Curated annotation (Swiss-Prot):
Its main location: cytoplasm. S-adenosyl-L-methionine binds at G75, F80, L126, E127, R140. This is Ribosomal RNA small subunit methyltransferase G. Its EC number is 2.1.1.170. GO terms for cellular component: cytosol. One of its GO terms (molecular function) is rRNA (guanine-N7-)-methyltransferase activity.
Amino acid sequence: MIATEEQARAFVAERCDAAGMERIEALVAALRSENERQNLVSKGSLGEVWQRHIADSAQLLDHVSRETGLWLDLGSGAGFPGLVVAAMQPEKPVLLVESRRKRVEWLTDMVKALKLENCDVAGMRLELLEAREAGVISARAFAPLEKLLRLSARFSTDTTTWVLPKGRSAAQELQGVSRKWQKLFHVEQSVTSEEAAILVGRGRAKT
Ligand SMILES: C[S@@+](CC[C@H](N)C(=O)[O-])C[C@H]1O[C@@H](n2cnc3c(N)ncnc32)[C@H](O)[C@@H]1O
């Protein structure tokens, strides 16, 4: 279990090259500065930004094979987890979906500043996004599982990998959805918190 900022930084460094680490350092610096202007993340979490946001996002890579297609991140907010993934693996195509204007501006600015040619921002509600096939679907603190699956099912295929950090509610939320959806997922322990878990799944979420 990651317990310190140093451990979190080392965890991330093991999963990307030096250029990736430089991009992540730049992202952290920009986040600290932008958070003075808009509430991208809670002030309290900035003191543990590597544990709470960066490593928390980076750990999803351990559940995803390297060759998957488009990584679709729903409700990216400040960029977690999608922007972190895009910065660590610039060969991975990533689409960040976010509806709030100021957050869309922040994400767009960061994609430009970090020179992430692999990463696009869809500044709109997910409901309005044109259907496309996603190799990976991620979403942290986006919506309750039932709603999340209903909104994103149309982007999934038989080979889609789902990585859904769900905090302490993971197992309970999974029990609350229909059996056809339960079958797709299992619960993985988060490495950033004893209490948190990630719903990892594979396949098409039929509606
Ligand atoms: C609680 S925040 C989480 C942000 C980020 N994923 C994180 O974990 O730090 C949820 C984000 O989802 C966005 N959002 C909520 N509903 C959405 C929708 N239907 N389409 C696109 N974005 C949405 C919100 O604007 C907000 O930025």
